[in-house]
Amino acid sequence: RYAQMRLAPARLTHCMRWLGAAARCQHIALEHARVRTAFGKPLIQHQGVNFMLADNEIAMHQARLAIRHVAWMLDQGIRARHESSIVKASVSEELFKVADRCVQILGGIGVTNETVVEMIFRDMRPFRLYDGPTEVHKYAIATQLERQGSAFTDPVGW
């Protein structure tokens, strides 16, 4: 029972840690894209690269908001088991994609130990398994939906 009460804060701790790591990857990739040139202009001016950086920013903003929401729920004394599963599943997947896009932007050096991005990318993969893999959380979310429906079917309720 005690372990169950600690799951939501533990999930959030992982999410916060990896949000910071993803932000570090984004910072490194952004600086690289500003300095490195290809075909006569900085990488950041190429649509494929700047769209990846924009996607990263969107994903990290959504992750930050989701984490803050569950943290607020916990501060209010709400167990937030369902919501912490949603956040853990979505944030772990999205932040892994952020790190992957950063590796892509960095090109060859993205997979070497020349930057910390490679280490973060490698270390971030198991994050999708900590405190239960994404599939386990999706199963728990679906089970909750089967029992009680969705919180989003009543837009006034939130």
Where are these regions (language model features)?
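Alpha-helical interface subdomain recognition
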Residues: Q4-W158
